[in-house]
């Protein structure tokens, strides 16, 4: 569901004004419709999760801080559908989608306004069921994997698929959703709503400071990379 869930301890009609999603994976049409909602009770806004490659060391951390502040300010201003996008222009580097979602999610919790908005993510780095399960587990209500869909369209154009691009994307979304359900079932969870924001993961290879800042509450027994290391890795990927 998307929208303002309000205070769970108070009876309010406005908390019932929600958009119901059939599944976490969205088509381009569904994603565009969410971004363009123009009805009383709904206020979507898009936020770019990117940073300048030439901004120097600390650019990723600064971008995450700015993203968190912008999202909080927007939610306090009435935005109840937060759309995070990693589409980058020339000279920009995308923030990993899971990191962007975790950053926004944890900051809104600390600010005490998490239930007032839901998060939708437009991402190019998520392609597998595990990627999607992690995003849902860290509070993404809707996911539009534009790169994966673009690859399917390209395969269809070149005749490498036995179905149309639209059917291929529908099959992909259905299979990915089945993958999420399979992962959930191994944890004894039967509904996506119960898995949403549950954070049933263990972080391996990240410093406690990094985990506490962006994935608070996640078990982490093996340290390793910090935000500076993630930034260097993203910069290398961007140059490839």
Where do the model's predicted regions map?
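Short, ordered loop/turn segments at secondary-structure junctions
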Residues: 87-90, 124, 140, 147-150
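Conserved, mostly hydrophobic/aromatic
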Residues: 86, 104, 135, 191
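Glycine- and other small-residue-rich loops at beta-strand/loop junctions that grip anionic moieties
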Residues: 93, 121-125, 169, 187
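Flexible, glycine-rich loop/tail regions that form catalytic "lids" or insertion modules at the edges
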Residues: 1-61, 70-74, 78-81, 131-132, ...
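Alpha-helix-loop-beta-strand connector modules within alpha/beta enzyme cores
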Residues: 95-119, 171-176
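Hydrophobic faces of well-ordered beta-strands that scaffold small-molecule active sites
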Residues: 45-47, 82, 117-123, 136, ...
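Glycine-rich, proline-tolerant flexible connector loops at the mouths of alpha/beta enzymes
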Residues: 84-99
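Catalytic cores of alpha/beta
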Residues: 125-138
